Design a protein with these regions (language model features):
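His/Glu-based metal-binding/catalytic segments typifying zinc-dependent metallopeptidases
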Residues: 20, 29-31, 145, 215-276
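Active-/binding-site microenvironments in catalytic and ligand-binding cores
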Residues: 24-26, 194
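Soluble periplasmic/extracytoplasmic beta-strand elements of cell-envelope proteins
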Residues: 14-16, 27-31, 87, 187-189, ...
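N- or domain-start disorder-to-order transition segments that initiate the globular core
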Residues: 1-24
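A generic structural signal for well-ordered coil/turn residues at beta-strand boundaries
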Residues: 3, 24, 82, 227-230, ...
Length: 413
């Protein structure tokens, strides 16, 4: 049980302390409740670009990374469809440096054309390297646009295309920052060797002077219920054929989500999994098979995927059928309580070992705070899952009319 202390500043910033005296270090994590889903459909990639711009300096801090490094620290960030996260790790006795730097860019980010052009080039190159030059690099683009027809999850975090990034202006960036990067839309968490009293005192000193301001309302178009199967074939620079079957499902923290998480573990996690025992040894066409879920706050997806040793269309069709049959079997041949217990224990071990690291804890606690979860009880919803629930949720999700099939074939030209 982790002793988590909390307070909220007058401007709405939630401040969380996780005191750990076993280390000489500390992590300062700032999580903003904004992500790619808050972009316009013709200006995608903006949230990720702004993440980069947050390191370009603020009014009183010209060199964010340089000042942090001089205090013995490092920093980084990530953007998802739902959130944007910034973190710094440094010796606990220098913790105030991180507070000063984070507060200054929350209050007064330096918007200028030079930094925008520099980071635009960096992000555009990142797009090319990750999405255009890597085998299966554009899988997320194709799969999201196949599964989501109206919801903003239909584009990836990096953006639909480089052209969107190219036309983002300084005014667009400034407006997005003003709409979303407010203290009341963020969580500040400190994990490590900094007592709660000092965390709250420093938060008051450096963040309380940032004025509260309203954030832009969120009004996403709801994804309609899928009533017919969809498919897409891509001929690309890939080493082998891949097949992905994606099924729409409910978002994070719903009962369906927790059960689906266990379903994918039973299907593909480890040598005792259904895919490993029933697909890989008996069928040499499968090079690998996997099952996973997209843990988004709003609509998610359950994915069944495989890489194949045979590049023929017939092999792809056969693999898709076998993936579907094996997953559907959970609805007709109930799993055992022992299988569920093993899956829950694996998940609990993963959570426990992951939280041994103070940086991982800082990020996880920040996320659970924004999601209004009890961090110390995150495993509890899984403990009551039954074989009957697994069968029921399998029937709800794995349905022929909800299939979204994406097949990659190696280019032959």
């Amino acid at each position: 049980m982790i002793d988590i202390r909390r307070t909220t500043l007058s401007n709405g910033l939630q401040v969380v302390s996780d005191y750990d005296s076993s280390t000489a270090m500390a992590a300062v994590n700032v999580l903003y409740n904004v992500g790619a889903r808050d972009e316009c459909s013709d200006m995608t990639g903006l949230a990720h670009l702004l993440e980069h711009l947050m390191f370009g300096g603020s009014v009183n801090v010209a060199d964010f990374d340089g000042e942090l490094q001089r205090a013995g620290g490092i920093s980084n960030a990530w953007t998802s469809n739902d959130y944007t996260n910034f973190y710094a790790v440094l010796p606990a006795h220098n913790i105030e440096t991180a507070f000063r730097l984070e507060s200054d860019r929350m209050l007064s980010l330096d918007f200028n054309e030079k930094t925008l052009e520099t980071q635009r080039s960096v992000v555009t190159e990142e797009f090319k390297q990750q999405c255009l030059n890597q085998p299966y690099g554009d899988l997320g683009h194709h799969l999201r646009s196949l599964v989501f027809t109206t919801h903003p999850y239909k584009w990836p975090v990096i953006g639909k295309e480089p052209g969107h990034i190219a036309r983002i202006t300084l005014d667009d960036v400034r407006r997005f920052f003003t709409d979303h990067y407010a203290p009341g839309n963020a969580v500040l968490c400190v994990s490590g060797n900094v007592p709660p009293k000092r965390v709250f005192s420093l938060a008051e000193k450096w963040f309380s002077g940032i004025p509260a301001r309203p954030t832009a309302p969120r009004a996403y178009r709801q994804e309609p219920v899928q009533t017919a199967a969809r498919s897409l074939e891509v001929n690309g620079n890939v080493p082998m054929t891949s097949v992905t079957l994606a099924f729409p499902m409910q978002g994070y923290a719903t009962r369906q989500y927790f059960v689906a998480d266990i379903i994918t573990d039973i299907l593909s996690n480890g040598e005792s999994s259904r895919f490993f025992r029933r697909l890989l040894p008996s069928n040499r066409v499968f090079a690998q098979a996997d099952a996973s879920i997209l843990g988004s706050d709003e609509p998610g997806m359950l994915m069944l995927s495989a890489r194949l040793t045979d590049n023929s269309p017939e092999a792809a069709d056969s693999a898709a059928s076998k993936l579907l049959d094996e997953a559907s079997r959970l609805a007709t041949e109930p799993v055992t309580q022992r299988e569920i217990t093993r899956a829950v224990n694996r998940l609990n071990s993963s959570l426990t070992f992951g939280n041994l690291n103070y940086l991982a804890r800082a990020q996880a606690i920040s996320l659970s705070t924004l999601r209004c979860e009890d961090f110390n009880r995150m495993i509890e919803p899984y403990r009551s899952i039954t074989p009957a629930e697994v069968a029921e949720v399998t029937r709800e999700i794995i349905r022929p009319e909800r299939i979204n099939r994406l097949t990659y074939f190696p280019r032959t030209d």
